[in-house]
Amino acid sequence: NVNFSAIFIISTTWIIYLNFFLRRVAKIKNKKWLSVLSKIYGFLVFIFIISFIIIEGLLIFNISQFKEAKDIEKMDYVLVLGAGLDGEKVGNVLKSRLYQAIKYYNLNNKTNIIVSGGQGKDEIISEAEAMYRYLIENGVNPNQIIKEDKATTTLENIKFSKEILKNRGDEDKKVLIVTNEFHLYRAMIIGDMLGIKNEGLASQTPIKIRINYMIREYTTIIIDVLRTSIYKIKSC
């Protein structure tokens, strides 16, 4: 992710530089098509910069608004989104998400916890199974844990979990989505788009890593909003 951020910043710098370069060339060459191309490109660069500022601004604002576990109302379902594993154990990022879920469970021990995450190519077991084991080890009633072990994307996390709720006759229940603060805004947007009543509980990420992930969220939010929109159209 550090590499992604570096590439993104360098690419953005070149995109902006190319805009000024095209304008200069168009002025020197005095070609109409170059002038038109320069204006179109300049407009696209403007849209890119404005959209980046808006999306990152919304992301930062929403992160500042997230509540602590103790301040969240009682809900029937908690949805923990998966992340990478360390062998058969949950990795540090996923452990931080489960820590928040357990903290909420201890305040509201009648809630059901959906653990959502499939098995990656380099993973021995599914993320859902690893989360299931970790929750049991930390005192969660296994009868209150529901495994969703097919999802490989955030959209699938939300979509497949919604199907679980529907099959249980609880489609209208409000869901507490648990993931890292940089990821939660996107997950909640998808939840809203798919008609899931939701609130968020964020786990913390070290600041040096968080910045990299937040920069990446600009592209992933756009991609996932488009994916979700296409999925909804196809589902009609």
Regions found by a protein language model. Give the residues of each.
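Membrane-interfacial entry segments at the cytosolic side of transmembrane helices
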Residues: 30-44
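A structural signal for short, hydrophobic/glycine-enriched beta-strand patches
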Residues: 35, 54-216, 230
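Solvent-exposed, charged interface segments at domain starts and junctions
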Residues: 1-11, 33-37, 114, 148, ...
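Short hydrophobic helices that act as membrane-entry/anchoring signals
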Residues: 213-231, 235
